[in-house]
Structure formats: structure tokens, C-alpha cells
Amino acid sequence: GSWQMTDALRLDAGYSTIDGEIDAMTVRPYVAGNDVPNAPEFTANLALTWDQNIGDLNLMARIEYAYQGDVFYHVVQGNDLDSPNGGVPGLGIAPNYSVPAALQNLTGEGGLDTSYENTKVDAYGITNLRVSLGGDQWTVTAFARNLFDEEYVGEVIMAPEFGGAFVTPGTYRTAGVEFQWNF
């Protein structure tokens, strides 16, 4: 929702929750009751915007915070069995798979373990900032995305049957200036 606090100041907020659970799975019956992968239990966002005309110019500043709860990236979670058949026959892959150490570095404490037992990535929050000054035909904007350079995992595609995972780190801090001309 939104709340117009004053003529120039607005607060926006949002919250969503998903209570997803795996009912049944033929190839891995032991995962029934686990969380649906790739779906955090909740997300939330908060933004404060100050938008003020100063003479013929418009000055706008906006700070945003977005939070994502813990998320599992595989149907196998916690102390579930590591594989339905004790490994992949003929490939010499043992039942206990190794998750790349890079996942620990990206998530810090409590992120993905070096064991296939834990396929959860910790919650994280990102702060963005924008400040714009504009006239009738132009706008100059300075911005910072992921202002505090939060390290987080953006996506994990688990492939334990093949000995690991494909990991995409979250977006690092980026900052810049944009110029817009309307003609």
C-alpha cells in the first residue's frame, strides 16, 4: 500500500507470503512435506519518496529496501535422504554430494553447507537509492543499487546427481548517473 504523508513525502510498503509445501513426489517420496523450492516464505519491501518542485525544477529522492526470506533451491532439504538410489550408478558419485565452497563464501554463516543436507540460502535485504533533478525536457539521476553491497545468492540450480550446483551470485553494488532528454 501507499501513504501520502505530506504533499512531497510518500511511503510505499508491501508484503507477500507463500505457504507452499510438496504434497507428493514419485521419484523422491521422502520429500513430501518439504517447502516448495525457489519460493521464499515471505518477501517485504519499503520505500520512502520525497518529490518536490523547486521553482521550474523537480527534485526527487527515493530510498527502497527489499527483503527476501530464506529459500530452498531443491526439493531435498534438511535431513532428507541424499539420493533416491544411493548415488548415480556407473558414475562413481557417492550418495553424499558436495556443494561448491563458493556457496559458503556468497552466503556467509548459515548459507548452503558443504553437504547436500542443506540446500537453503539465507534471507537477505537490499537497499537502493535514487536522487533526480529535472526540468521540462531533461532529468539527471544519480543512483546506487545494492547500496550496502550485500552479498547474497541470486539463484542456485542444484545438480547433486552430477556432483554440485550452478550458482549465480546476487547483483553487486552498482552506482551511476543517468541523463534523460525528452524531445
Language-model-detected regions and their locations in the chain:
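Gram-negative outer-membrane beta-barrel transporters
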Residues: 1-76, 178-182
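Flexible, solvent-exposed coil segments and beta strand-coil junctions
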Residues: 22-30, 105-112, 154-159
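Generic secondary-structure boundary/loop-capping signal
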Residues: 19, 33, 51, 121-123, ...
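C-terminal beta-barrel architecture of Gram-negative outer-membrane proteins
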Residues: 39-134
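Extracellular loop and loop/strand-boundary signature of outer-membrane beta-barrel proteins
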Residues: 27-36, 114-118, 162-167
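C-terminal beta-signal and adjacent terminal beta-strands/loops
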Residues: 66-88, 132-183
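Surface-exposed loop/turn and secondary-structure junction residues enriched for glycine/proline
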Residues: 8, 12, 21, 25, ...
